[in-house]
Amino acid sequence: MSWQAYVDDHLMCDLEGNPGHHLAAAAILGQDGSVWAQSTAFPQFKPDEINGILTDFNEPGHLAPTGLHLGGAKYMVIQGEPGAVIRGKKGSGGITIKKTGQALVFGIYEEPVTPGQCNMVVERLGDYLLEQGL
């Protein structure tokens, strides 16, 4: 399966029990910041933004004072799983990032999608990739 198919079929899919509702944007990036696959609406990001995210995975709490920035948008960092998941909130939407052995799985949502739905979609794919050694 191509990386784009993972984004299209597993991240941008309709949410369980909510046909027509899906994430606003999603991507899979290598830990070097290279884009493996992304949805059309995934924001253009700066390398420094990805470096900040990677630093927070290695040093949990790094982004808390400044917020998580992606594509110029600022997210308030909320409770995640140190070293494994970063979650952010911005207005009525937010972001979930799951770190795997080689990749970062991103999901961005807006209402009516809930934080829990975004977490479930992103973390399920991230856990699958971890099981596959990726």
Curated annotation (Swiss-Prot):
Protein source organism: Olea europaea
Segments carrying motif Involved in PIP2 interaction: 84-100
Domain of life (superkingdom): Eukaryota
Subcellular location: Cytoplasm, Cytoskeleton
Record PROSITE patterns: PROFILIN
Keywords: Actin-binding, Allergen, Cytoplasm, Cytoskeleton, Disulfide bond, Phosphoprotein
Subunit structure, as described in the record: Occurs in many kinds of cells as a complex with monomeric actin in a 1:1 ratio.
SUPFAM superfamilies the record matches: Profilin (actin-binding protein) (SSF55770)
Residue positions, PTM Phosphothreonine: T114
SMART domains in alphabetical order: PROF
One of the record's GO molecular function terms: actin monomer binding
Mod. after translation: Phosphorylated by MAP kinases.
Keyword Disulfide bond included in the entry's annotation: yes
Stored Pfam families: Profilin
Cystine bridges: C13-C118
Role played: Binds to actin and affects the structure of the cytoskeleton. At high concentrations, profilin prevents the polymerization of actin, whereas it enhances it at low concentrations.
Stated name of the protein: Profilin-2
Misc remark: The variability of the residues taking part of IgE-binding epitopes might be responsible of the difference in cross-reactivity among olive pollen cultivars, and between distantly related pollen species, leading to a variable range of allergy reactions among atopic patients.
Principal place of residence: cytoplasm
Family from the record: Belongs to the profilin family.
GO cellular component: cell cortex; cytoskeleton
